């Protein structure tokens, strides 16, 4: 399609939309193992291309357009919702960055909704903290008129300005991280990635933080996702002036069911992809290559890995330091003779007992290179089992 001039206008329009977008730039490689008929395994790593970005732009625009159209009409929908970062996780990342001496501090997320005053937001927060309902703080409010009304389907959506402020702060952190040394930059990138919540379906529209949209409903894939089929049926009802096919109660039940099933399906996909790739590695295969259906002894091989996360009792490593392949190493693999600890900020692996000098020996630090080798695969966890080189 890139070389076909029939698509020139579509590419230009998509590029214009992309230039105007205000959203996080988080692109991860997609691992694509293929099990061939003779049981050989072919593995490729796919990154976004101009063509896939163009298609994604049109799909997102279509989903948002249909969501707003049906939302204004009052149609019950299984909205695709994505929440902003969790306050506790922002605090944890800030503490980690401060301990690393990185001059990046993320502000606490705001949870102000469309049309909500600052005092009402404060009341909601205080009520949530106290696990009770607190009467709104009295304020002088302007008279409500048609211009100030908030459409019912947007009542629970994060205020666009509040959402914009959070996104701006995260993008600013990304920009600052790009000028840091590799060791620190990867830590910041990984931390920002893990701030992102998992999207889900809900009968209440909560907006889509990652896409920076007030309303988002899956519509473009009715042959493989039931929520898309629901949106198609509701749209037909609107066009024909008929009653909604799905009412609010049924939509709520289906949205919850689809969310649960999508999580299960995603975990199964991750495990299958991971295990196929790990078997490929055990056969001595590489990325963008085919491994034979034989099992010769693995030759001693190591990767120039980088430590990207420390969470007791695991050390997570990026094998090629490019974000494509990750595995994990148990603390016991780093030193079988003594017990090791990870500090509260997830910055260092140290000896649990002090040495003769009274100091705790530092075994490894977050962001450091740590060459490793493959021990095997954790079939149930779907992860590479690593050991020091």
PLM segments and residue spans:
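C-terminal structured domains
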Residues: 349, 353-369
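Electropositive polyanion-binding surfaces
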Residues: 1-346, 367-370, 376-388
């Amino acid at each position: 399609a890139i070389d076909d001039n029939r698509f020139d206008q579509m590419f230009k329009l998509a590029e214009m939309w992309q230039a105007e977008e205000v959203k996080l730039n988080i692109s991860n490689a997609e691992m694509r193992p293929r099990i061939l008929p003779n049981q050989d395994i072919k593995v490729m790593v796919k990154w976004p291309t101009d063509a896939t970005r163009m298609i994604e732009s049109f799909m997102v625009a279509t989903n948002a357009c249909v969501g707003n159209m049906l939302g204004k009409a009052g149609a019950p929908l299984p909205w695709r919702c994505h929440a902003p970062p969790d306050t506790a996780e922002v605090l944890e990342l800030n503490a980690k960055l401060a301990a690393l001496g990185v001059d990046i501090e993320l502000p606490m997320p705001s949870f102000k909704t469309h049309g909500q005053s600052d005092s009402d937001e404060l009341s909601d927060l205080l009520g949530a903290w106290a696990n009770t309902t607190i009467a709104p703080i009295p304020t002088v409010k302007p008279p409500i008129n048609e211009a100030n009304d908030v459409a019912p389907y947007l009542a629970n959506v994060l205020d666009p300005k509040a959402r914009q402020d959070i996104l701006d702060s995260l993008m600013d952190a990304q920009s600052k991280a790009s000028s840091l040394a590799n060791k620190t930059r990867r830590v910041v990138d990984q931390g920002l990635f893990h701030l992102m919540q998992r999207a889900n379906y809900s009968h209440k529209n909560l907006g889509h933080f990652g896409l920076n949209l007030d309303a988002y409903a899956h519509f473009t894939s009715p042959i493989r996702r039931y929520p898309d089929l629901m949106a198609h049926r509701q749209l037909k009802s609107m066009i024909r002036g008929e009653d909604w096919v799905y009412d609010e109660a049924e939509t709520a039940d289906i949205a919850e069911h689809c969310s649960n099933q999508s999580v299960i399906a995603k975990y199964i996909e991750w495990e299958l992809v991971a295990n196929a790739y790990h078997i490929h590695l055990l056969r001595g295969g590489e990325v963008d290559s085919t491994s034979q259906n034989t099992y010769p002894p693995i030759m001693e091989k190591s990767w120039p890995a980088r430590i990207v996360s420390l969470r007791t009792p695991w050390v997570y490593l990026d094998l090629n330091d490019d974000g494509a392949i990750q595995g994990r190493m148990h603390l016991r693999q780093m030193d079988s003779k003594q017990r090791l600890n990870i500090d509260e900020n997830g910055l260092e692996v140290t000896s649990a007992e002090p040495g003769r000098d009274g100091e705790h020996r530092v075994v490894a630090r977050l962001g450091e290179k740590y060459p490793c080798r493959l021990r095997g695969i954790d079939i149930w966890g779907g992860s590479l089992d690593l050991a020091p080189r």
